[in-house]
Amino acid sequence: LATDSAGRETDIAVDHAEHAHLEASDIARVRDIMRHHGLTATVSSIHINGWIGDHHKWAGALWAVRLWLRRDLSAEVDHWVYIGDSANDEIMFRHCPQSVAVANIASHWGQLQHFPRYVTAGQRGIGFAEMVQALLEIK
């Protein structure tokens, strides 16, 4: 399990790249076992996450923007930028035309059906900083 499991209330997370290092076949096997037992399961850059229900990042983003900003994200999604790094961001890449992925998305590319519009040259935090710098330059 992931080291932050004690703080999780709505999902289970299995570490595959934060402190442990699982092979791709083992990651797929854990994800498939979760799905076989009725969980929704995705793979992030560090965890294999499983949960009960059909909630996901896009539904959560719609809810959070409506609740805290009193705005309709689906009506103005063209004005938002989403940045991700793994296969579990695919639903956001599908819904967000201004989507960005950091370079380490490359290891998940073959799992995607919906792709980010832009991929940074830098990985992880460096890629995020690259995206922020680009936004600041065009503002």
Per-segment meaning from a language model:
Residues R71, S99-K139:
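Asp-based, Mg2+/Mn2+-dependent phosphohydrolase catalytic module
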Residues L1-V81, S86-H95:
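Conserved acidic, metal-coordinating active-site core of Asp-based
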